[in-house]
Amino acid sequence: MAKNYYDITLALAGICQSARLVQQLAHQGHCDADALHVSLNSIIDMNPSSTLAVFGGSEANLRVGLETLLGVLNASSRQGLNAELTRYTLSLMVLERKLSSAKGALDTLGNRINGLQRQLEHFDLQSETLMSAMAAIYVDVISPLGPRIQVTGSPAVLQSPQVPAKVRATLLAGIRAAVLWHQVGGGRLQLMFSRNRLTTQAKQILAHLTPEL
C-alpha cells in the first residue's frame, strides 16, 4: 500500500515543532506562543478527524515544525543547534516506540489525558496548573520508559521554576506527534531512505502558506 507522505510529513513536523520549542525554552526561557498552543492542544484532542485536525486543521499551525524538519533533514552539520534538534527528534521517536510496546502504557496515558480534559473546563491550556499536570504525565508515564532526553540550554533558564514544566509538557506533545507519525505510516528508515520525498513534501506545504509579515 502506498504511503501517504502528506500525513507522514505533517506528523513529523509535529515532532520537530516540539523539538524546536523545547530548544527555545531551554535556551531563552520562552518560545513561539502560537506554535506552543498548537502543540499542547494536540495532546488534548483524542479523536481527531484527520492528521491535520490534530494540529488545529491548518497547515500554517505547523510552520515552525515544517521549517525545523527541513533543517533536520538537510543538516550538514552534526554540531550546535541543529544537532540538538536532531537529537530531540530522534529521542522522541525512540520513546514513542517504548511507549507503544510497554504493556498498558498507552492506556495509562489515555486515562491521564482524559483528566486533563476535565481540568480544561476550569483552567486555560497554558496556565501553570495545566502545564504542571502535563509535565507530571510526562514524568510519570514517559520518563520511566527511558532513555531520558537530556535537554541542554542555559543553566539559569533551566533552573527557573516554570521552564522545566513547560519543557516536559512540550516533550509530551512531541510524544503525541510521534504516536500519530507511526499511526499514519511513519518509520525511522524514512529519515534515511525517503529524505528527498519528505523534503519535497515539506517544501510544497510551506510554499502555499501565506508569508509571515
From Swiss-Prot:
Pfam families attached to this UniProt entry: DUF489 (PF04356)
Intrachain disulfide bonds: none
SUPFAM superfamilies assigned: YcfC-like (SSF101322)
Localization (cell): Cytoplasm; Cell inner membrane
Keywords of this entry: Cell inner membrane, Cell membrane, Coiled coil, Cytoplasm, Membrane
Cellular-component GO terms for this entry: cytoplasm; plasma membrane
Coiled coil regions, renumbered to chain: 79-126
Topology versus the membrane: Peripheral membrane protein
InterPro entries per UniProt: HflD, HflD-like_sf
PANTHER family: HIGH FREQUENCY LYSOGENIZATION PROTEIN HFLD
Family: Belongs to the HflD family.
Protein name: High frequency lysogenization protein HflD homolog
Lineage: Bacteria, Pseudomonadati, Pseudomonadota, Gammaproteobacteria, Enterobacterales
Gene name as annotated: hflD
